[in-house]
Amino acid sequence: MLRIAATALLSLLLLARHSLRAAEPAAVMNFSCSGSAEANDTRRPVKKIGLTINILERTVTVSGLSVFAHVDSADDVNILFGGESTIPGDLGVTGSIDRVSGEAWYLTFTRGKDKKVNRREMFDLVCKRVQ
């Protein structure tokens, strides 16, 4: 009887440990996003924009952009990110993704030689996790 109880307890402990591992957030999260982009008061649909978030390296990449963003803050729900090139006139990005609902946005901008920020495009997206 003691052997059966010990086996059952060991099984429960192993299951609990496996469940805890499954609940841990993935270090790298890939999203496929669709929605709209707005520039100069003109809105257009966008599809299959890839977002890759690496929590350990604290980086975010957006498909089609030449700049890498850094994770400014992250919690169980929201990830805020931003980054820009050090070369005047090059692209910058700032944004956020709700990893529970999949709602995301990001804004691209350039900064002129005068350090003035010029808005390029605003993206409103709904994202789904992909492998």
Q: For the regions a protein language model found, what residue spans apply to each?
A:
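Bacterial N-terminal signal peptides that target proteins for export
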Residues: 1-6
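Short, surface-exposed loop motifs enriched in S/T, G, D/E and P with embedded aromatic residues
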Residues: 66-74, 125-127
